[in-house]
Amino acid sequence: MEEFQGYLELDRFRQHDFLYPLIFREYIYALAHDHGLNRVILLENVTYDNKSSLLIVKRLITRMYQQNHLMISANDSNQNKFLGYNKNLYSQIISEGFAIIAEIPFSLRLIFSLEGSQIVRSYNLRSIHSIFPFLEDKFPHLNYVADVLIPYPIHLEILVQTLRYRVKDASSLHLLRFFLHEYSNGNILIILNKSISIFSKSNSRLLLFLYNSYICEYESVFLFLRNQSNHLRLTSSGVLFERIYLHRKMEDLVEVFVNDFQGILCFLKDPFIHYVRYQGKSILASKDTPLLMNKWKYYLVSLWQCHFFVWSRPGRIYINQLSKHSLDFLGYFSSVPLNPSMVRSQMLENSFIINNAPKKLDTIVTIIPLIGSLAKAKFCNALGHPISKPTWADLSDFDIINRFVRICKNLSHYYSGSSKKKGMYRIKYILRLSCVKTLARKHKSTIRAFLKRLGSELFEEFFTEEEEFLSLIFPRTSFTLRRLYRGRVWYLDIICMNGLANHE
């Protein structure tokens, strides 16, 4: 019991962070409106003493403010007054400032936890592409997989109660309730189809922080019980907390869940179960029978309903045989098909035929949804035929080409891990021809005449850095170059999905 408490507990002297005095610091609101602020500045300032205090946090805010000089303009034509001020502008400023304040102690706790556990803080671990090497290594040896859609809380008070486990400052929690009720205009239910946000995009930082708090609470309990069932500790769970800038579970949940779920854990012992999540979608995979996966499914539903008061149905979790099912995850269709191969072996006068069916993770680009995203962005029509981009026709030729090239290279960079590259050729074709049509529209020329004038120099701009580097080493027609083009590459500098790749 003591080792589990040590695994989950927070340092006692940091459990009572008083956040409300920071609300009266003018620097907070300047930082909140500086949308170019990189929160890595906060994580890199680790030279402070581990015993954090309000004074240290204030000094850190002052240092960040001095690095990001920004003047807030209060000019707004909306005359709807709120406590004597402009309601929309000042409510937005205060809410963004509150999100900044709430993130600071959580980020500091993360730094201290990483230092205490001697985990090397590698920014490569935050890359979402780091998930796929893990899947390549583990999935060929597993049999069943479950698609899990994490339910969203439909009541704003659930988000506040979740944050209450970590923030002991009652004044800040009351202020948070005020923000949520004020923005929702009395409608305290969250209607969720594609986003958790019922607010405008400018208030997404506060909602994102609250949602990450909710996810962290759920996963810390889930990982704790999973580790307890196996009597092992996951060494890779620290990646999750670095990715969302939050810390582990508080100690008071240990007693609750150890007592309530002790009888269930004996049925959930499986050292081969694996868990992967990105945003609101997660994957459970196991080498065992479907019976164990069904037990985990009903356990998760009970966890959501009984502790987080979030309604969920077992039908939201789909269990499938991995060799016959494709996972739509992070813009890829991932599957582990059986690839039968036949080998003839001869020994003296006897010959043998050996049938082998190795498993290998296939990652395929979802072309149809990607074309739909391009059509929505007005690069092509619904059938995938390229069209011009009239809104960019007023830009210079350099800016037009640069925008198309940047989009093409970003997509190629993100989908570099695809098993089949043919689909990306069509995407590049759409972007190249859309670029040519936009330039021809600007110069009031035909596509053929414009291409004849520019030649092949325009299309060479669309080469990725990898293609340019390889073309300098190998001839364009060589077999080695074509084989390297078809190979999969996972980049560890991608920390979010490409906007066109996110079809949800």
From Swiss-Prot:
Its biological purpose is as follows: Usually encoded in the trnK tRNA gene intron. Probably assists in splicing its own and other chloroplast group II introns.
The name of this protein is: Maturase K
Keywords for this protein = Chloroplast, mRNA processing, Plastid, RNA-binding, tRNA processing
In which compartments does the protein localize? Answer: Plastid, Chloroplast
Molecular functions per Gene Ontology: RNA binding
Entry's Gene Ontology BP terms: mRNA processing; RNA splicing; tRNA processing
Q: Which family does it belong to?
A: Belongs to the intron maturase 2 family. MatK subfamily.
Source organism per entry reads Betula papyrifera
By its UniProt entry, which PANTHER family does this protein fall under?
Answer: MATURASE K
A single Gene Ontology CC annotation of this entry is: chloroplast
